[in-house]
Amino acid sequence: MMNYLHKSFILLIILFVFFGCQEPPKETATKGNLKCLVDESLYPMVSAIKDSFSLKYPETKIELVKVKAKEGIVKMLNGEETMFISSRALTEDEVNFYDKTKSQVKIIKFCYDALTAVVDSNHKLNRIITTELKQLLLGNSKQYRIYIPDQNSGIFENLKVDLTDKQNPKGAYIVKNEEEVVKRVKKDKNSIGLVGLNVANNSKLKILRIGTDERSATGGVYYEPAAGYLANGEYPLIRACFILLNEIGVYVGSGFTSYITSSEGQKIVLSYGLGPATVPIKYKQIVRMR
């Protein structure tokens, strides 16, 4: 009996030494490094969320890299990157590739953004309907010059889906990115630019209220791109934004995703004027304008 107890005691010591010598995991959801691609439209907001996350979890180091929507999605579907925050959903071709390759990339909707029409701060225009924007984009109207970012941007793809019936916007002046759209509109006083809400809010340009055709059910009502109208679907040019995550195990990518979709992350989304998609948020009452 004593011999058995002695052997058991030695075994316990060996197990204690073995497990005691094992190093704790180097990376967890709140400890480690992450490279995260971010759509240019969403960069200011995501940067603020990253700063908040890093303050709460100081053992994380997140590098944000600004890219176009198409570039980010292609890299994710090819398995080249861990995380991308996108201003648009996958196109039909991208969905087919996703299904064909049995991709393990997780896709999580986290907020609602607005396609915004901006003009010079002194421009007489205050509102516009979607039909007018469509005619400008297709070249059927020359009343204003209209600037949009290039075909790799989320804006370009969103416009094809939401406004031009998948036709190329041959009437638009296509520039490098959303920042360039802002620069062109500031120089060209008789122009309209189409950018994401984050970019519009930082541009010091006038943001137009958007309405639908006067003959439609909601005709005559114009909406500003306020968070409440984005979340409830009333703003005419809404786009859902997504997190694409390609991470095996639970590491910083998973932790950052959880934070973005948590009440803390969604409050930051709201503070930037976008509509939260994962938690219920109270909004200030907004009066519709005609």
Predicted regions, residues:
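Bacterial N-terminal signal peptides
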Residues: 9-18
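Short, conserved beta-strand segments within well-ordered enzyme catalytic domains
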Residues: 37, 63, 82-85
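Exported/periplasmic ABC-transporter solute-binding proteins
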Residues: 21-58, 65, 70, 77, ...
